[in-house]
Every structure is written in structure tokens, then in C-alpha cells.
Amino acid sequence: MRTGRISRKTKETDIQLELNLDGKGVADISTGLGFFDHMLASFSRHSEFDLKVRAEGDLYVDEHHLVEDVGIVLGRALAEVLGDMSGIARFGEARIPMDEALAEVALDVGGRNYLVLKAEFASPQVGQFSTQLVRHFFETLASNAKITMHASVYGDNDHHKIEALFKAFAYAMKRAVKIEGKEVKSTKGTL
């Protein structure tokens, strides 16, 4: 089974995360940020990765440190579980609608980190979650997971746009980490 556990404790946050890429989409999430919990649970459900997150942080300051550090830990867990990336499909993409919103995500799980995100939000926050943190979360995750991610979303409702992005990311990841053999998908023979 492709599973991992990662912890991170700083003066700002304390995070424990468990990940199973070959799970059933079971989520057990507690970050103290309801909307963020909902997005992580949605990612778990639609990727079919089992995901357990226990995160505490200095929310009295704001949610930035907590969201950033969850991105770090989830990215590191993905990198650890995938190892040298032997046998995985490597590439994944998805187009996911949510009512008036449409999100597209294309991934290369190939050891090089980069994010291109085309997204505009009308509201500064959804619940207690700053819409500025959507980009920061995915940048941090991509950097630590060593994945390249191109994503775009349009729509009218910021909740729908963000949720469609998380779901599209989930389906793209599910496809990219699918086992398709034993070889590394690279002409170099390594990633």
C-alpha cells in the first residue's frame, strides 16, 4: 500500500497527516477552518485517497500559517509516498463543473515543481478562508510534492470556483498516480 505519515510542529502550527493513495476516499479532517476542512475532505473523496489531518495553528493571527503548513505537509506526504514515481501514469488532467463554475487542472507528477493558476475571486473570504490562500496553498503543495500544476477556473460564486478547483485537482491526481506498470515514465529513465 502507498501510505505515509508526516508531522510538522513549529511555533505557529502543529500538524499530523496520514495519507493512503490506495484508499476509498475516507476523510478525517480537523483544521479549525470549516471551509478548508470541506475542501480537503472533497479532495480526499474525489481522489479516493484516504486522508487524515489534525492541524492546530495560530488562527488568532489569521489562517495563513495553518493553510500554508498543511500544503507543506500534504506535499511532502505525496512526495514520500510516490518515491521515485516508478509505475505511475505521471500525467493527469480533469475538467470539473460546479453549477456555473468550471475548473481545469493538468498535472505532471514528475519531480519538477511549478504552478500556473488562472483564478480570480470577487470576495476576500469564503467563511474564514481567505481567497488569497487558494494560490498559496497550491503553490506550497506543488513545491513540496514536486509536481507541475496548471489550473484555471471561472464562474460567479467563489465557493463553487474553489471547490471545483479542489475537485479537479483530486481527479487529476487520481489519474496521475494510477499504477500503469513498473517503469518510470521518462525518456531519461528517472525523474
Curated annotation (Swiss-Prot):
* Catalytic activity annotation: D-erythro-1-(imidazol-4-yl)glycerol 3-phosphate = 3-(imidazol-4-yl)-2-oxopropyl phosphate + H2O
This protein's pathway reads:
Amino-acid biosynthesis; L-histidine biosynthesis; L-histidine from 5-phospho-alpha-D-ribose 1-diphosphate: step 6/9
State the compartments where it is located. Cytoplasm
Q: Which UniProt keywords apply?
A: Amino-acid biosynthesis, Cytoplasm, Histidine biosynthesis, Lyase
The record's GO CC annotations read: cytoplasm
Spell out the PROSITE patterns in the cross-references: IGP_DEHYDRATASE_1, IGP_DEHYDRATASE_2
* Gene Ontology biological process terms in this record: L-histidine biosynthetic process
GO MF terms here are: imidazoleglycerol-phosphate dehydratase activity
Instruction: Please report a single Pfam family linked to this protein.
Output: IGPD
Main localization (coarse): cytoplasm
Q: Which EC number(s) are documented for this chain? A: 4.2.1.19
Q: Which InterPro entries match?
A: IGPD_sf, ImidazoleglycerolP_deHydtase, ImidazoleglycerP_deHydtase_CS, Ribosomal_Su5_D2-typ_SF
Per the similarity annotation, which family is this?
Belongs to the imidazoleglycerol-phosphate dehydratase family.
Q: Known HAMAP family for this protein? A: HisB
Matching NCBIfam families: PRK00951.2-1, PRK00951.2-4
Protein name (record): Imidazoleglycerol-phosphate dehydratase
Q: Which organism is it from?
A: Methanosarcina acetivorans (strain ATCC 35395 / DSM 2834 / JCM 12185 / C2A)
The gene behind this protein is hisB
